Amino acid sequence: MKKSLLGLTFASLMFSAGSAVAADYKIDKEGQHAFVNFRIQHLGYSWLYGTFKDFDGTFTFDEKNPAADKVNVTINTTSVDTNHAERDKHLRSADFLNTAKYPQATFTSTSVKKDGDELDITGDLTLNGVTKPVTLEAKLIGQGDDPWGGKRAGFEAEGKIKLKDFNIKTDLGPASQEVDLIISVEGVQQK
């Protein structure tokens, strides 16, 4: 009886220790603590910045075991906003995002590796009907308790994509072939 009680206690401690380490988070879209931004050079003379205003996602974060981390994000591509209505309409057209045919973009991580202070998050990005691997360099900004009794974790990530890789063939000149992704998310831990 003592052995089985000891075994049960040990097993429950192992289970609690493991579950306390990995945590699932929902991106805080409602509180506006998350941003999916981008920039591209305009003719090589300046940077044009934009954002996607409507997206949702989740992530699993285990600080001690990055290989267990996961990220899943869905972006409503019709929500693209560059602070210029005519340009946004053009970006939604078949020349760029083709939102009538592909109203969503998705990112699903396939691996997460620690690289010094950063995490290299590699995953499949589906955009404009094309799926390609993309690596984002992410950094933990902070984590801990919030004033409402919950727990939060925040990250910033950056990456690059080439327009032609996602079947976007509009030629904006040699300086405008790549898009920089600048992402900031805060997640609320799920219970």
Curated annotation (Swiss-Prot):
It comes from the Bacteria. It is found in: Periplasm. GO terms for cellular component: extracellular space; periplasmic space. Residues 1-22 form the signal peptide. Pfam families: YceI (PF04264). Keywords: Periplasm, Signal. The keyword Signal applies. Belongs to the UPF0312 family. Type 1 subfamily. HAMAP family: UPF0312 (MF_00780). This is Protein YceI. It comes from Escherichia coli (strain K12). The gene is yceI.
